Amino acid sequence: MTDEVQAPALILVVDDVQEIVEELVALLELVDLPAMGAHSLADALAILEAVTSIQVVACDVRLNRESGLEIIQRVANNALLADRPLKYVFMTGDPMRPDAIAAQQKCPVLTKPVQPRELIALLRDLLATGSAVG
């Protein structure tokens, strides 16, 4: 029996569909990208406050009655998070919106269903670069 020390999470996946969060977190863990999941913006902010190792937030655009895009402003307005250099990736099921969202938020947008290789490559690139949005 081996005692594996789990690496601190680097990525926070935010989606209101529990199965999607679980699948993406499991996928990222398989490729050595430690991740955690949240199902709402409130959950995401609480996790970001508690887990300082997170560097990238991968968030669905539509979260029940919330807009996932609001996470950038909520982080900026949070005294504990405002100075944190987080990077963002948004995911949308609306194929007509990715370019508009990317231009408005100045961050990458992936169209659902998200292609695993594309997501993994993008997250690795964001973790490797020093640029952040916010």
Language model feature labels by segment:
Residues 1-12, 18-25, 77-85, 108, ...:
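Non-catalytic signal-transmission and effector/linker regions of two-component phosphorelay proteins
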Residues 14-15, 38, 57, 91:
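Conserved sequence signature across two-component system core domains
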Residues 32-41, 47:
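Short hydrophobic/Thr-rich beta-strand motif most characteristic of the beta2 strand and flanking loop
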Residues 82-96:
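A short, hydrophobic beta-strand element within the central beta-sheet of small alpha/beta folds
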Residues 101-110:
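As written
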